[in-house]
Amino acid sequence: MSSSITDEKISGEQQQPAGRKLYYNTSTFAEPPLVDGEGNPINYEPEVYNPDHEKLYHNPSLPAQSIQDTRDDELLERVYSQDQGVEYEEDEEDKPNLSAASIKSYALTRFTSLLHIHEFSWENVNPIPELRKMTWQNWNYFFMGYFAWLSAAWAFFCVSVSVAPLAELYDRPTKDITWGLGLVLFVRSAGAVIFGLWTDKSSRKWPYITCLFLFVIAQLCTPWCDTYEKFLGVRWITGIAMGGIYGCASATAIEDAPVKARSFLSGLFFSAYAMGFIFAIIFYRAFGYFRDDGWKILFWFSIFLPILLIFWRLLWPETKYFTKVLKARKLILSDAVKANGGEPLPKANFKQKMVSMKRTVQKYWLLFAYLVVLLVGPNYLTHASQDLLPTMLRAQLGLSKDAVTVIVVVTNIGAICGGMIFGQFMEVTGRRLGLLIACTMGGCFTYPAFMLRSEKAILGAGFMLYFCVFGVWGILPIHLAELAPADARALVAGLSYQLGNLASAAASTIETQLADRYPLERDASGAVIKEDYAKVMAILTGSVFIFTFACVFVGHEKFHRDLSSPVMKKYINQVEEYEADGLSISDIVEQKTECASVKMIDSNVSKTYEEHIETV
């Protein structure tokens, strides 16, 4: 085992005197201490705590507030993020056990496991104290991400509110125009994979800018598409951008924020989707006052926000957290090379990556299958209840443009409130019970929202319906992250979400086709001229609420599972310590490389990068 250049705290019988740094190693040679730019050895003194965890000494090179914030975050990851100290270290329950006894025990505990109400604490539920800790830079990055997701939703719902003029322009039935909505959802998975890999590996900034540039192109070109085929091609670009923007926008918005504030900020961030719908319907109505083709101006006007965001993002560097991640990766790689006897690590080829992915799927196939099925329901909920709402209000109920605008705005305000309130409410109920409550309430409001067919009923019941739909989404992201296994969280959680989204891509097209089976009026030739969209939306939305309820009930949860990566946390702490001492990470890596070039007597067996990570 190679020695470590990084600072080591000595526990047990060995004690380190204050003001001294003790280097030790387990190999056959000693490594030199780290030095600063002038060649002077660094005398780094770590923080020391007594058994009661009272701080006896802190590094004077770090500001007091910074030290306290770091300590708070570490305690939060270990204590606040654990419910009564429950940890899931081995994750044995992620591996399927299909014995009869295991299945029986699991089935009998589906109801009783819901009865545990977690301890109520205003400190856990009230986000205001933590929001006050947000700096202006934190808010700057948050709104940069928030408005990027809003612009994506705005671009998507521009088609939803313009179905009627688009159908007239291309002389196509409504179901063909709604296929443009479905196409966006179909190709979102491709965008998520392409830009997700780029975002995780290299940058948050440039994928963000690229996706926004694609939105500008798509929104600018859509009104100029003179054929239906060109229209679909342009919406295909929108789908790629929409799939890619979510990951980099959410990371930009959340990852630098205080840890305790992230739950509330996550719910607020997702509400940008509903706000995008509000922007689309308001400006559609506003431009419709002046011109019959006001929908074209809506598309062109919507590009101002992504253009503004592109210039805004160009002015700011990568987030602080991601900058530390990039530096930590350099340290991880240098330590892995050192552990490999100084030899460069071989890169895994495509076949080896596929074999690794196959092993992961074989290990977690049951959990993965459950998560895919679970995600189908909420994705259908969103699109089945929202995408055709303006069409139903205009074409079936014959409401005025002003009434349609008011209803869409009010119901989406309900969606915004639901996401934030349920996001905090689940801290008391837990994930599953919170989801079941949202599904039950939503099912109760489905019939009056769609079937009473009056403006007042839609305003009241519709507000509560979308309150519950987005209440589901206020809980689901963290529930999904907690269920996914630690060693395959990105693969299992990300792929299951995208497959669930893919399954729901045709929701609006299915609704328009089913509406033809429930005609309200026919012309002299027997052709349907007025469809019952409300009945179809009520049937599909109610069915999906029941489906989602069943999936959540038979599932399980890992409330407040620790989502942090111990390896990355360790190396990020090293980055912070080195930079606090005025060291360059590049210099640290160079020194590690020089030390790794020294031949060790016991270096006959080389380590892989994965084995090094396991050792850490």
From Swiss-Prot:
One of its GO terms (biological process) is plasma membrane pyruvate transport. It is a multi-pass membrane protein. The keyword Membrane applies. GO terms for molecular function: carboxylic acid transmembrane transporter activity; selenite:proton symporter activity; sialic acid transmembrane transporter activity. The modification N-acetylserine is found at residue 2. GO terms for cellular component: cell periphery; fungal-type vacuole; mitochondrion; plasma membrane. Residues 162-176, 227-230, 285-296, 385-402, 454-457, 511-535 are extracellular. InterPro entries: MFS_dom (IPR020846), MFS_sugar_transport-like (IPR005828), MFS_trans_sf (IPR036259), SA_transporter (IPR004742). It is found in: Membrane. PANTHER family: CARBOXYLIC ACID TRANSPORTER PROTEIN HOMOLOG (PTHR23508:SF10). Essential to lactate transport. This is Carboxylic acid transporter protein homolog. The gene is JEN1.
